[in-house]
Amino acid sequence: MTKQEAMERFSSGAVQQSLEIHRGIQWTGRIVGLLVCVLIVKYLPSDWAERILYYLLLLLILWTLHRLGESQAFICEKGLVLKRRPFSVKEYFHSLFHGDEYFVFVDYEHIIGFTEGWRELQAMNGHGGIYVIPLDLAQVGYKDKMAMIEAINKHSNL
């Protein structure tokens, strides 16, 4: 999901910042992935059936490398747009092809906080109940996490 899509899909106001996986993790993943791709091409078997499997593996790795730079969250004027973690294996495979459907908007005034490992967001609904949104923000950079906390603190003190 892009910044423009986040603004159009949710009534979140202007997007102030996009959060991605830490750059070091992205580059490490890309280097390792490309090395594996080179090894796959170098040791490609001569049997056509095995060759098809190797090509499918190669496509899967390249697709995964492409997805490393996708946004995990957006800091907006009115709240956070977060990519929630799938609940089941079926949802996981659905999220590979329809990742934009897993973004949710949470208003700043409803946010209670994040769990210690950045795996869940705890928020309060309109009736006073608490709900938990599973997230994958553990690999987001420290500065981006602190920017998210600053935005929550800034808007919750109003």
Task: Mark where each language-model region is.
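N-terminal membrane-targeting/pre-transmembrane regions
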Residues: 1-42
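Hydrophobic alpha-helical transmembrane segments
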Residues: 28-29, 41-58
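Generic detection of short hydrophobic beta-strand segments and adjacent strand-loop junctions
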Residues: 12, 17, 21, 103-106, ...
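Short, surface-exposed beta-strand/loop "edge" segments at domain boundaries and coil↔beta transitions
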Residues: 28, 82, 87-91, 128-133
